[in-house]
């Protein structure tokens, strides 16, 4: 398999997207950063190209993804968006179709923790835990993964679920990876820094170990 060099990063100016952008550039990837507001990206780097595009439009997604070795998406319509549930699912279906239309095979998605199991048969999003105002967005990511992405056979996708609590912190490089069960520490907390999450995602980009499946991270 040829090494991934050129990537498209959707949602590159957001909380997770900006961490992914920094990690990818620091590791020498050529990045096309796809954003709604290009002025939000202040980085200057010879390997960075910033493109304004509406990822809810199929042809715009396909055009911007053409020629890439892989597409990474950190798209989020905004936690305060009243239509976050519908928009998340609708736009991600468009992104997947655009990636296919562009002829790109590898797709890595910033997932949510909601679809992780916290006990046998019980997913976080069905447990009543977590802030209620975030539930529509959490459920949208979880249901997109369970109802759509898991059935996707045409492209080599990955859905990378963070720990339940992901915050700005430091890049330690010391974390654990898992599959469908939430990873918790010795006192039962599920947490990760966004910097370590980004490092693990770019590791997966550079050294693929997961194919058409979800994986997760935690300390």
Regions found by a protein language model. Give the residues of each.
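Substrate-positioning beta->alpha
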Residues: 140, 188-202, 213
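Conserved catalytic-site region of short-chain dehydrogenase/reductase
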Residues: 80, 114-119, 165-169
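Conserved beta-loop-beta element that borders a ligand/cofactor-binding pocket
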Residues: 146-168
């Amino acid at each position: 398999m040829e090494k991934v060099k050129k990537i498209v990063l959707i949602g590159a100016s957001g909380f997770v997207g900006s961490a992914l952008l920094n990690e990818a550039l620091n590791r020498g990837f050529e990045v096309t950063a796809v954003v709604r507001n290009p002025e939000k990206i202040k980085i200057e780097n010879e390997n960075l190209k910033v493109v304004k595009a509406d990822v809810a439009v199929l042809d715009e997604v396909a055009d911007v993804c053409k020629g890439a070795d892989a597409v990474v998406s950190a798209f989020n319509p905004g936690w305060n968006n009243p239509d976050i549930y519908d928009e998340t699912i609708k736009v991600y279906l468009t992104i997947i179709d655009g990636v296919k239309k562009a002829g790109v095979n590898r797709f890595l998605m910033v997932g949510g923790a909601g679809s992780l199991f916290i006990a046998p048969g019980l997913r976080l999003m069905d447990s009543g835990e977590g802030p209620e105002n975030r539930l529509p967005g959490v459920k949208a990511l979880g249901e997109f993964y369970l109802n759509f992405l898991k059935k996707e056979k045409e492209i080599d996708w990955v859905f990378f679920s963070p720990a339940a609590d992901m915050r700005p912190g430091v890049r330690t490089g010391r974390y654990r990876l898992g599959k469908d069960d939430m990873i918790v520490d010795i006192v039962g907390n599920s947490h990760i820094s966004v910097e370590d999450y980004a490092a693990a995602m770019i590791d997966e980009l550079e050294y693929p170990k997961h194919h058409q499946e979800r994986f997760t991270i935690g300390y």
